[in-house]
Amino acid sequence: MSRVLVIESSARQEGSVSRQLTAEFLARWKAAHPNDEIVVRDLANEPVPHLDIDLLGGWTKPAEQQSEAEKAALARSERLTGELLGADVLVLAAPMYNFAIPSTLKAWLDHVLRAGVTFKYTENGPQGLLSGKRAFVLTARGGIYAGSPLDHQEPYLRQALGFIGIHDVSFIHAEGLNMGGDFQQKGLARAKEKLAQVA
């Protein structure tokens, strides 16, 4: 049995294409892996604070020197990191906001990309500590950006995940969703075809 960690980052609950892709992915995954445990963290319902001085203090100060706010910030980071460490499969669902990922997802990444926990520095440079995990990234985009200089989602997420040792990453993009005509239908159909191949 494997554990699947799903991170939802769309601000929308209704009408969200990235959430629609997540539902499609999970339906297929559960059918193929009925005994797997699914853990869902919804960053719209439970926002993760952006990196702040309390979290930095929690990471760097000895426990006896931490304020209550720093202890609370560290406990939150430990909880989020623990979910990632305990997962075999990571699913990131992210609409494209202004060419990149939602700030809520960036905040989550800031909590879990941690020196000494998910990566370490060595004399040969940084080394990811989460090798062996698999990741799927489900994106929803109003235009068509894959492979273009305007796509700051896929390059950043590949870099961030690779930095912590997750190199087996599949991207499923639903593109052209706001372009009118049959672009939305075709974009969704292509994304679902890709999901059927990888999930």
Swiss-Prot record:
Cofactor(s) of this protein: FMN
Keywords: Flavoprotein, FMN, NAD, Oxidoreductase
Disulfide bonds: none
InterPro entries documented for this protein: Flavodoxin_fold, Flavoprotein-like_sf, FMN-dep_NADH:Q_OxRdtase_AzoR1, NADH:quinone_OxRdtase_FMN_depd
Complexes and interactors: Homodimer.
Membership in a protein family: Belongs to the azoreductase type 1 family.
Name of the protein in question: FMN-dependent NADH:quinone oxidoreductase
Organism: Azotobacter vinelandii (strain DJ / ATCC BAA-1303)
Originating gene: azoR
